[in-house]
Amino acid sequence: MRINPTTSGSEVSTVEKKNLGRIVKIIGPVLDVAFPPGKMPNIYNALVVQGRDNEQTNVTCEVQQLLGNNRVRAVAMSDTDGLMRGMEVSDTGAPISVPVGGSTLGRIFNVLGQPVDNLGPVDTNTTSPIHRSAPAFIQLDTKLSIFETGIKVVDLLAPYRRGGKIGLFGGAGVGKTVLIMELINNIAKAHGGVSVFGGVGERTREGNDLYLEMKESGVINEENIPESKVALVYGQMNEPPGARMRVGLTALTMAEYFRDVNEQDVLLFIDNIFRFVQAGSEVSALLGRMPSAVGYQPTLSTEMGSLQERITSTKEGSITSIQAVYVPADDLTDPAPATTFAHLDATTVLSRGLAAKGIYPAVDPLDSTSTMLQPRIVGEEHYETAQRVKQTLQRYKELQDIIAILGLDELSEEDRLTVARARKIERFLSQPFFVAEVFTGSPGKYVGLAETIRGFQLILSGELDGLPEQAFYLVGNIDEATAKAMNLKT
């Protein structure tokens, strides 16, 4: 991994002899800059606009095109208000570089790696460029292994792959943020890992809410910031398209350092991957490229691949990525989600219906899928248990119309037993979270995969048919459910 040791930890690497150009054209966030003959900067180099009297205006741009006639076209990473033709632009000689390492934990950064949380400068002298190639084949760890989350519904029915990519589908208010925070908490405790959250084109309010909730739940430790378990990188929807297009790479670069240098398991959240594509589409239009299908950029697959292929397991560690996916107009054939799906190993679908019932986490057990749920990967016992759970829930779903019209009494004895077990399974799929202790009062539970399988096998076998279904609601393992049933009887 290429690391730039610097003395200041600034957002761009500096070179001794400045290569200076001048702005000749400004169109919104796009600048055309003329350089002296033979001094053209490379593609992806960071340029810094100099203010009058050598004052920096703090506008950093990234070279996107070499136009000929000693001119380059660059995209700004912040607002271009106040810029004028003739202003000096200095070529830094390197791509945008951002701080990396343990001192990034508990902090909020923008696309340039500058802290935006008013907690002072980042205590590090190590930076890394945001553009790099994916790991070579020889470095990859091709072994298929399950990434245990300690969340029953995920581990049993749609297990995550270590170093894989997971799509998280959910609307507002169904518990997406709480699920994200629980995953961050569990990876820190069970795997000794850290997390990086990349807010790509999201609402400023949502980013602020997530930060405050993380502080409240202890994921970010206010008293001792370095003890925190997550670094946050935000490029909000009010920022120029250049910033929104590159903020995912900034977050990924921080995650890669933890994987390659610290040799840790890293969880990388990207919310929302669609906004990354959308920003790329805006930049593509500004650069004058001919649009492709549905108005998207012609380089859609390449841009998505350059991000996704860097998210992988190596011999040193792993980056497991959870990406929120917005589906425009619920059209799964839209080029943006369709391109994303090609890279996903699992999908976790959050259901408003389950959230309305109070089943948390509100993960839909029938809609969520995983390529890992195969007997040769998870073993026969896990696979058979998961399939029987899904069959029971599917049968219950089919019977719900009959129950609504005629009532339970009209069902056959076998169907009534199926419904009773399905309702127990549905409730047993709920679980108290560590990060929700603050407002539920129930201590959180981490349930290992073996315990999860044992619990569902006992429900399916009929051994627990005599227990009331409310005993299975918001408990950890099956022993807690039986103990709760005893308390309900007394």
Curated annotation (Swiss-Prot):
Entry-linked PROSITE patterns: ATPASE_ALPHA_BETA
Record-linked CDD domains: ATP-synt_F1_beta_C (cd18110), ATP-synt_F1_beta_N (cd18115), F1-ATPase_beta_CD (cd01133)
Primary localisation category: plastid
Catalysis performed (reactions): ATP + H2O + 4 H(+)(in) = ADP + phosphate + 5 H(+)(out)
Gene3D superfamilies the record matches: 2.40.10.170, Bovine Mitochondrial F1-atpase, Atp Synthase Beta Chain, Chain D, domain 3, P-loop containing nucleotide triphosphate hydrolases
Example GO BP: proton motive force-driven mitochondrial ATP synthesis
Claim: Transport is one of the keywords in the record: yes
Membrane topology designation: Peripheral membrane protein
Pfam families: ATP-synt_ab, ATP-synt_ab_N, ATP-synt_VA_C
GO MF: ATP binding; ATP hydrolysis activity; proton-transporting ATP synthase activity, rotational mechanism
Protein origin, superkingdom: Eukaryota
Localization (cell): Plastid, Chloroplast thylakoid membrane
Enzyme category, top tier: translocase
GO CC terms in record: chloroplast thylakoid membrane; mitochondrion; proton-transporting ATP synthase complex
Binding site for ATP: G170, G171, A172, G173, V174, G175, K176, T177
UniProt entry keywords in alphabetical sequence: ATP synthesis, ATP-binding, CF(1), Chloroplast, Hydrogen ion transport, Ion transport, Membrane, Nucleotide-binding, Plastid, Thylakoid, Translocase, Transport
EC numbers: 7.1.2.2
Job of this protein: Produces ATP from ADP in the presence of a proton gradient across the membrane. The catalytic sites are hosted primarily by the beta subunits.
HAMAP family tied to this protein: ATP_synth_beta_bact
Subunit structure: F-type ATPases have 2 components, CF(1) - the catalytic core - and CF(0) - the membrane proton channel. CF(1) has five subunits: alpha(3), beta(3), gamma(1), delta(1), epsilon(1). CF(0) has four main subunits: a(1), b(1), b'(1) and c(9-12).
Stated family: Belongs to the ATPase alpha/beta chains family.
Name under which the protein is recorded: ATP synthase subunit beta, chloroplastic
Organism for this UniProt entry: Ipomoea aquatica (Water spinach)
Native organism taxonomy: Eukaryota, Viridiplantae, Streptophyta, Embryophyta, Tracheophyta
